[in-house]
Amino acid sequence: MEKQALNLINLYNERGKRHGYWEYYYENGQLMSKGHYVNGNRDGYWEVYHSNGQLLRKGRYVNGERDGHWEWYWSGGQLEKKGHYVNGNTDGYWEWYYSSGQLSRKGHFVNGEFIKEKEQTELTMDEIAERFGISVSQLKIKK
């Protein structure tokens, strides 16, 4: 009951728009999402949860649009996908994962348009080095 009472403080601004910190709950009482509104728009860091309490997705909003790095998770807690948004559009490098944690595929977006996809087996030497945080010269190739 106290969590619900917290939601009743400063929910709306003088124009009747959502403003400030909000929490939403599933009917079972489990936290559904939490984050801030500014003048009716989501703004700042938000987290959304599966009904079992596991994190579903997290990321940042700017004036109601997704912006920056976002991550989604399977209901068991494993990473499902991650990537970037710019002004609400998918943009840049994205990765998708199986629920086992294994990389499924990766791709690249420009201003919301899907440009390129690579299978896991098509990683370049530069991409492998970047993933492990080392230089290409540090890679050791076994034949």
Where are these regions (language model features)?
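Glycine/tyrosine- and acidic-biased, solvent-exposed loop/turn segments at the edges of beta-strands
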Residues: M1-M125, R131-K140
